[in-house]
Structures are given as C-alpha cells and as structure tokens.
Curated annotation (Swiss-Prot):
Cofactor note: Binds 1 zinc ion.
Organism of this sequence: Cryptococcus neoformans var. neoformans serotype D (strain JEC21 / ATCC MYA-565) (Filobasidiella neoformans)
Similarity annotation: Belongs to the peptidase M3 family.
PANTHER family referenced in this protein's UniProt entry, alphabetically: MITOCHONDRIAL INTERMEDIATE PEPTIDASE (PTHR11804:SF79), PROTEASE M3 THIMET OLIGOPEPTIDASE-RELATED (PTHR11804)
Gene that encodes the chain: OCT2
Function: Cleaves proteins, imported into the mitochondrion, to their mature size. While most mitochondrial precursor proteins are processed to the mature form in one step by mitochondrial processing peptidase (MPP), the sequential cleavage by MIP of an octapeptide after initial processing by MPP is a required step for a subgroup of nuclear-encoded precursor proteins destined for the matrix or the inner membrane.
This protein's name: Mitochondrial intermediate peptidase 2
C-alpha cells in the first residue's frame, strides 16, 4: 500500500482537548541469520552502574560509534539477557513512567480522586477571578486554564495509552474507569459558563502587563473550543445543542463501528464454475473454497482474505467483478446511519449559527473555510487528474495485451481502441504492472538490513546531524514499563542535555494491536510560576491520595523559568527479538517508524511555555508536517544508504536494491494520490450539507463526484462511502494529510534536497542532513509546537517574496500551496 493510505490508517492517539466535545475523538519479515564475531557492548546510564552485555553477534558499519552500538543492542538483543527486561535498574520498584503514584492498578482511582479535587479548586479559582479587585487573578486566568488542562489531560492521555497497550486487564479496566470519570468531568466543564466568561474578560481586559502573544494564542484556542461546545448559547438553544451532540455521538460510533468491520458478510458471494473463473489462483486455493449445494458454486465472504486474493490474481474479469460488487454492495441500513450522522452535524452547525459542519470545524484550521479547502482540492485534482488518467491508460494497455495476446506499447498515447477499465480491474493489473518492473518477479529483501536496532541507531544519527539531538538507551526501574519488551530512550541535546523521554513499545505480543500510534504521556510546559498556593487548598490536602504526576523541574537553554519535560510513547508491531535474531522491518514498517518519529521529535523540540500548544498540540491540518518530512528522508536513497546495514555482517544495503525499492514504492503514485483527493473532496461535499436538505443522497453525491474528477468510473449498485470510516473522526478535515504533504514537499526542496552536490551517495547525504537546514526547521517550526500561526512558520521557512505571501494565510497563500505538487 502507498504511504498516503498507510498514514491515514495509522491509529491516531489524538491530544486530549481541554474542552471535551462529544463529537470529537480524544483523539515483519525475517531473514536467515548468519553468525558473526562476538561483540561486547555497553549500555551507559549516568545514574546507575554500567551493564556489560556479552552476547551473540552484533555487527555495525565501519563508521559506527559507541552510541550506535548501545542503541543497536538496546533493540536487537532479547530481553532475557537481563532476566526480565533490558536494562533493569536494580533498585526499589517504581510506578509506571517512574511515577510513584502508579505502582498498581488501584492507584489510578486514588489519582483520579486527587485530580478531581485539585482540578475543582482551580475551576473555582478561575470562575471567581473577575471578583479580585487587584486584577491579579484575572491576569492568571490563561495560566490557570492551561494548568487545569495539563492536570486533566496528563491523566486522560496516560490512561489512553494504558488502555490500548497494557497487557494486564486490571490496568486496562482501571484506566477505562479513570478515563470515563475524568472525561465526564470535562463534560461538566463544558457547561461551566463561569470559566468561559472569566476567559473572555481576561482577553478583553486592559492589563498594565498585557497578555503576551503566546498567552493570547492559548487563550483564543480555549475560547474557540468553548464556543464550539455551545457554551455561549442561550439556555434553550444550548439544550438543543446537547440533544444533537448526544445523538451525533451515538450515530458516529455506530457508523464507525460498521465501517471498521468492513463489508457486510451476508449475503455471501457465489462464483459459478470456479475452476474456470478463478484461473490464476492455483488449484489448491480453488479446491479449498467452500461450495454451495447446487452446481458447486464457490462461496466467498465479502472482505475476506480469499476475496482480496481473487481481486488481485483472478485472470477472469467476471470473477473479480462478482467479488468487487459483493464487497461494495449498497447496504440501506448502513447508508441511513451515515446520512443521519451527516444530517445531525448539519443541524448542530445550524444551532451554532454556522451554515454547515465544515464551517464549525475549520474555523481554527489553516484553511479557515470550506471554500478555501475546496479551492485547494480542486487545484490538486486539476493537476493530478491527467497524470492519474495516464497511469490508468497504461493499465488499460496491459489489459488489452492480456485480452488479445497482442502487444500494446505502454508508451503509445493512443487510447481509442483500448478496452474499458473497471474498478475491479485495478488491483489485478496494478499487481501485474508492479511485477513487470522487476525482472526476477520480486525485489530482493531489504529486511536483513533493517533490524530495529540498526534503524533506531540510524535515526539517532539523523537527528544528531539535523538538530544536535540523539538517543541514549536508558535503564528502567522495575514497574516503570508495562511490558518487559518496552525500551526507554532518553532524548539528549548536545548543549541542553536531557530534553525528553520516549518509550518504545515496538515488539509483538499476544493481544497487542497491530496498528502504529504516537501517545502523549506528558506535555512540556513551564511549571515554576504555577502559584499552587493560590488554589486555596488546605495544607496536606493530598495526604489521603498520595502523590500526583509531579515532574522534575528542568531549566531550558535560552528560556526563563523551569519546565516539565515531555514523555511520549510509540507503539508498533514489528515482530519479536530472539536470541541471535533481531526483529527485522519491512519497507512499510520502516516508513511507519520514520513517520511516527516525526511526531516524536516534534514533541521533544516543541517544549513551549504552555501545555495547550506543546509539541503536537497544533492544528489538524498542520500536525502531520513533521512526520511527512521524515517520510521524505526515508525515501531519499542518499539517506537510506547511510541507514541500512545488514544486521549480521554490517554490510550496507546495495544501492541498486535501494533504487529498485524506491522505484517500486513510487509507481502508480498519481493514481493513488488522485483517489485520496477524491475522498477529501467527498468529505467536504458531505460536510457542506445545509440543515434542511431532505433530498440528501450520499451515493448520488459520490457518483457525481467520480463523474466529474474520477479516472475510474463507479459501479452501479455499490456504495463505497459506507466504508469511509474517517468521515467520523476526520469529518471536514480529511484534506489535512494532502495539505501537509504539499507543504512538506516544498520545505523538503527548500531546506534539504540539494541536487547535484556530488555523485557519491554519502556526500549527498551530508548535504541533505545539513545542520543548517535542521536548525532552520527547528527554530522556525518545530520549537513552537502550536504556539504560533502555522502560516507564519511556513512563510519563514520558505522565505523571500513567496514566504511573505504565505505568511498572510489568505486566499493567495492557499492558492500557492494548491499549486505545489503532492509528492
């Protein structure tokens, strides 16, 4: 699958919003092992004795450093080397994430009670702030709202991680309970008008010490979230808002559940004369299929593995047609749920005084309005449609050759006499085309060159060269991680020292989700000026509950005050580490790891003064930018040649193999990108529905869109939109990944892609991995998190007249982004 689809399928662990809106989601291949000389490697930790690892072969490239060795050992050696886990600190038991308050599942409820008491005190303080005659409390409203957000989200976000990755059900159950209680408390805050009024007064008040630019941005984000929740509405109107919000929550979950489950499994698909129609799949496959009692028709379950194999390998188009239509057939019940959800959103938008749901959602995004999104997507569609059509015509020529036995030159532009190309032809002829690119039928495996440790040490080198940031393997205390296979990395800047912690849950285990996700455990923020005494809680109020999630206060270079450092966790499923054989990544897993590391490094560098704009807490149509840039790095042959080394021999991945894999990965990309553009346009058309449009027909809209901009015509009787699950979680913002890909491509070519610097790959990599480019990206984009207008950040990076135009964030800026190619 292509990277657009891969990234959009990743499970997104979304940031905890302070204002919890009901419709808003909180949101491996193995190769044979060849023994090599034994290595002695060290894992260093400044706070504990050094462990010596005497183990089976670890081979590194000639230029590898001791840090490379330590990182490689950290991920490539089995955890049994240390008994229970890699790098266990021999001291008393700590709690999860080194918090003393999280030593057992039951401690979550004590933490919940403690959090509710502290949060309630801050809420009361904010509500009465306007009554302070000195104005001091009003001046602290933004700071205290941010503290409140940090206290609540710190627990909610952590529980989101625990309930998704912890292997023990007691922890999962308790985290579910805590999550539910605190989210319910947030819903109560939605109705606390005093919070909204105090914030509005603080924004408008003429303080002698005015709110800073950062404070104003944080304040306006809070204000927008409040108003999106209907807090400013009259009581009778707000009752309607709550009613429609509850209905929308139910409909959204119902739609998402059905979309996630795939096509309806009944009725089954029946294929007559299977030995003839299923030619190309092999007799063993055909004989294994269940049969009906009459005429021996093969029975296929829609959406099954067998159905996928038929779409990909069955030579007879009739078999593929039966399977395609059977998997996409219109289901009136599912369609009615989708359309009810969309109509409910339109009505909710009307309650909020907006024309449509897209207006509600986009008000705080880079694009600002649905009209701007449509202009961007229309521009992309116009650019990509001819290229995508050319790729379809190439597949049509392959179909003509297969049907007639006559050779049709793929380079011939004449299409008049070519056969029609149907939706059920795409997988089959795409696979034939990709196979034709490789003389041997399949590319050499790259997995032996991509052990988890090799890749992680390579990422550390990349970040060191770009930002002066590297990874240091860290020992963990008993109880600090949720499974023995979880590795901890301390993130260290060459001048500032420790700047954050990453927990890496990469390896397979029973019951673990196969998706990839970035979880925020703790955001950065300034903590030395919290004024906790002003909350009015009595001395020793927290003794019955034990400690909270207090963090050490750290000084940051060039910033006043002290900060709590960010903690994030990355979850993937890349196989297991065994004695003598590390977990090896395939190409898709490599891309995914780089993508997630883009989010991780954004969290580490974006150490802002305020929690609510820290790291990845930024606009939906901006947050993917750092991760997409990392995809550019991994797709660069120059960079990949410095990253991939055989796990057993230390030999570099041959350049021809790199080039073959990159060429294969980028083939038919215009067709896939155009499909994503069509999906984003459909999302906008659905969410610009106005309240009262009773004639709304989601299938007709999809068919009309395909007639306008599609390159493969839709099939009568099908309703693909039933399976478009992102319509719930990404309603009106599905364009975001395409938008960020356009911006990332421009930044990549501006800062990093220096063509013609040298014929040698390693010297070209020196140019791409330039400190100058990395520092510009860090200083102008990453360090701000969500604390600065993203248009200004992008404009600063691009520079010149074009950068000045972009900084305005107006229609001209959007037109510029729309003119950039999505690569």
């Amino acid at each position: 699958m292509r990277r657009l689809q891969q990234s959009l399928r990743r499970r997104s662990a979304r940031r905890c919003p302070f204002i919890l809106i009901p419709h808003r989601l909180l949101t491996t291949s193995y190769a044979s092992y060849k023994p090599a000389p034994q290595a002695t490697l060290e894992i260093e930790d400044t706070n504990s004795p050094t462990f010596l690892l005497k183990t089976s072969p670890i081979q590194l490239p000639a230029r590898a450093t001791s840090d490379d060795s330590a990182i490689k050992a950290h991920f490539d050696l089995p955890h049994s080397i240390f008994g229970d886990m890699v790098g266990v600190r021999r001291e008393h038991v700590k709690g999860l994430f080194h918090y003393d308050s999280l030593t057992q599942p039951e401690s979550l409820m004590r933490l919940t009670d403690r959090t509710l008491i502290q949060a309630s005190a801050i809420v009361q303080r904010i509500v009465v702030a306007p009554q302070d005659p000195t104005g001091r409390e009003l001046r602290l409203v933004v700071k205290n709202l941010d503290r409140l957000s940090d206290i609540l989200c710190g627990v909610i976000d952590m529980c989101e991680l625990i309930r998704n990755v912890h292997p023990h059900q007691d922890w999962v159950n308790q985290s579910d309970r805590t999550h539910q209680i605190l989210c319910s408390f947030m819903n109560e805050l939605n109705a606390t008008r005093g919070l909204y009024e105090s914030l509005a007064k603080a924004i408008a008040h003429p303080f002698n010490d005015p709110l800073t630019t950062s404070e104003l941005r944080v304040a306006r984000i809070f204000l927008t979230d409040f108003e999106r929740s209907g807090i400013h509405l009259p009581p009778s109107v707000r009752e309607r808002f709550v009613k429609h919000s509850d209905a929308l929550l139910f409909l959204g979950r119902s739609f998402l559940s059905s979309a996630s489950s795939g096509p309806s499994t009944v009725p089954h698909i029946e294929i007559p004369d299977p030995h003839r129609l299923l030619t190309g799949l092999g007799r063993q496959f055909v004989d294994s299929l269940p049969r009906t009692g009459r005429n021996g028709q093969a029975v296929i379950e829609p959406g099954s593995w067998e159905a996928q194999m038929i779409l990909r390998y069955a030579r007879e188009g009739r078999a593929r047609e039966l399977v395609y239509v059977g998997g996409m057939r219109a289901d009136k019940k599912r369609i009615s749920v989708l359309e009810a959800m969309l109509k409910e959103r339109a009505e909710l938008a009307s309650v909020l005084g907006k024309n449509n749901w897209a207006e509600v959602v986009l008000v705080d995004k880079m694009t600002k309005t649905p009209e701007n999104v449509m202009r961007f997507l229309t521009s992309l569609a116009q650019h990509h449609q001819p290229v995508a059509r050319a790729e379809v015509d190439m597949l049509r020529r392959m179909k003509a050759t297969a049907l007639t036995g006559n050779y049709f030159d793929p380079r011939n532009s004449r299409t008049r006499h070519l056969p029609l190309f149907h939706a059920w032809d795409r997988d089959y002829y795409s696979d034939k085309y990709l196979t034709s690119l490789i003389p041997t039928g399949s590319p050499p495996s790259i997995s032996p060159y991509l052990s988890t440790g090799t890749v992680m040490s390579g990422l550390s080198r990349i970040f060191s060269r770009l930002y002066g940031i590297s990874f240091k393997p860290a020992v963990v205390s008993p109880g600090e991680v949720w499974h023995p296979s979880v590795r901890r990395l301390d993130v260290v800047h060459e001048e500032e020292g420790l700047i954050g912690v990453i927990y890496c849950d990469f390896f397979s285990r029973i019951g673990k989700s196969s998706g990839a996700a970035h979880y925020t455990v703790r955001c950065s923020r300034r903590v030395d000026d919290d004024d906790i005494d002003g909350d009015g809680l009595p001395e020793d109020w927290d003794k019955p509950y034990g400690p909270g999630l207090e963090a050490d206060k750290e000084s940051l270079s060039g910033k006043p005050g002290k900060y709590q450092l960010p903690i994030i966790a990355l979850s993937m499923d890349v196989g297991t580490v065994n004695e003598g054989r590390p977990a090896l990544l395939n190409w898709q897993e490599l891309e995914t790891l780089f993508h997630e590391m883009g989010h991780a490094i954004h969290s580490m560098i974006g150490r802002t003064e305020y929690h609510n704009v820290s790291g990845t807490r930024c606009a939906t149509d901006f947050v993917e930018l750092p991760s997409i840039l990392m995809e550019h790095f991994v797709s660069s042959p120059e960079v990949l040649s410095t990253l991939a080394f055989h796990h057993a021999t230390g030999e570099p991945l041959p350049i021809p193999v790199i080039e073959a894999h990159l060429a294969l990965n980028q083939s038919l990309s215009a067709l896939e990108t155009h499909g994503q553009i069509a999906m984003a346009l459909l999302d906008q058309k659905y969410h610009t529905l106005r309240h009262g449009q009773d004639s709304f027909d989601s299938t007709a809209i999809w068919f009309q869109l395909q007639q306008e901009i599609g390159v493969i015509q839709p099939v009568p009787g099908t309703a693909w939109q039933m399976q478009f699950g992102h319509l719930y979680g990404y309603g009106a913002t599905y364009y975001s990944y395409l938008f960020d890909r356009a911006i990332a491509g421009k930044i990549w070519s501006t800062l990093f892609h220096r063509s013609g610097t040298s014929q040698a790959y390693d010297r070209k990599a020196e140019g791409i991995l330039s400190r100058e480019g990395g520092e510009l990206l860090k200083e102008k984009v990453l360090k701000w998190g969500g604390g600065r207008d993203p248009w200004e950040m992008v404009g600063d990076v691009i520079g010149g007249v074009e950068g000045d135009e972009l900084s305005k964030g107006d229609e001209r800026a959007l037109a510029l982004v729309g003119s950039w190619s999505v690569v």
